[in-house]
Design a protein with these regions (language model features):
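Catalytic activation segment of kinase domains across protein kinase-like and atypical kinase folds
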Residues: 223-250
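ATP-binding glycine-rich loop module of kinase domains
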Residues: 62-121
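Protein kinase catalytic-loop region centered on the HRD/HxD motif
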Residues: 214-222
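Conserved hydrophobic "DFG−1" position in protein kinase catalytic cores
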Residues: 77-78, 148, 234
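Active-site Asp-x-Gly
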Residues: 100, 171, 182, 245-250
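ATP-binding glycine-rich phosphate-binding loop
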Residues: 3-81, 89-91
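Protein kinase-like catalytic core scaffold
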Residues: 84, 128, 144, 223, ...
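Conserved structural core of kinase catalytic domains
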Residues: 124-206
């Protein structure tokens, strides 16, 4: 799946509108200070939270757009156009927690995703990832298109739970007729889920995939991490895919 010229034109128009309304250019962390009984607390607050309310009325009314963000990138979604979402990278001016490259330049986490998707294609496991491509650049900001995938945390968590329960069954002395024992069993499952590493989460979701070992190796080699339930989604053709796979260099 690759974006068409019409898809790229749509994304370009949206980005032009964002800049025209000073939306993206203001997407920067501002240092704030709060006072409490013990003294002062310095923290950073992303203005995106404010703009989501201040600006979203215009963009939702005129374009049907919804805005989401993580630590490293922003995502712009039109739920009436469920083919692609627009992703824009954050840098240290957006989030001071983002690390720089060794040469001092900011890390483009969206570019990392596009590069890793290309390598996944070369490995023949691209169906496990939401397709990601660079779409253009405006005012020095590159933007990207990623295959639309609907996040369903409950479904992904169910996969984690099923996998974890099978593992816990191997060592837990379970008594299904003992209510207290069953409660302890369920607690042990959730503890197991909380301790699962990213490769285990991949196995939980892609357990029937013929290339599961190759996928796990790819996840490890590419430093793909933080695969919690909100970083998965379901594409229009029903595939469950990873939607945030740049890896976080915090």
């Amino acid at each position: 799946m690759k974006p068409t010229i019409a898809d790229i034109e749509w994304a370009t128009n949206i980005m032009n509108e964002l800049f025209a309304h000073n939306f993206y250019t203001a997407l920067r962390y501002e240092e704030r200070t709060s006072t409490y009984s013990g003294g002062e607390n310095h923290y950073y607050e992303l203005g995106f939270d404010e703009w989501e309310y201040a600006e979203s009325g215009y963009f939702r009314e005129n374009y049907g757009l919804h805005f989401y963000r993580g630590e490293t990138k922003g995502c712009i979604v039109d739920f009436n156009r469920q083919e692609w979402v627009i992703k824009v990278p954050f840098d240290r001016s957006t989030n001071p927690k983002c690390r720089r490259n060794e040469d001092g330049t900011s890390i483009d986490y969206c570019a990392l995703e596009a590069e890793k998707y290309a390598r996944a294609c070369a490995e023949g496991i691209e169906e496990c990832f939401a397709a990601t491509y660079e779409a253009g650049e405006i005012n020095g900001v590159k933007f990207y298109l990623q295959e639309f995938a609907n996040v369903d945390e409950d479904s992904t968590t169910d996969s984690f739970y099923e996998y974890a329960s099978e593992q816990v069954e191997n060592y837990f002395n379970r008594d299904e007729e003992d209510e207290g024992n069953e409660e302890l069993f369920r607690e042990e499952i959730w503890d197991f889920i909380n301790d699962m590493d990213d490769q285990e989460r991949v196995i939980a979701v892609f357990n029937d995939h013929k290339n599961i070992r190759k996928i796990c190796d790819f996840i490890y080699d590419e430093d793909i991490n933080d695969l919690h339930s909100a970083n998965w989604g379901f594409t229009n053709d029903g595939r469950e895919v990873i939607i945030d796979y740049s890896g976080y260099k915090g």
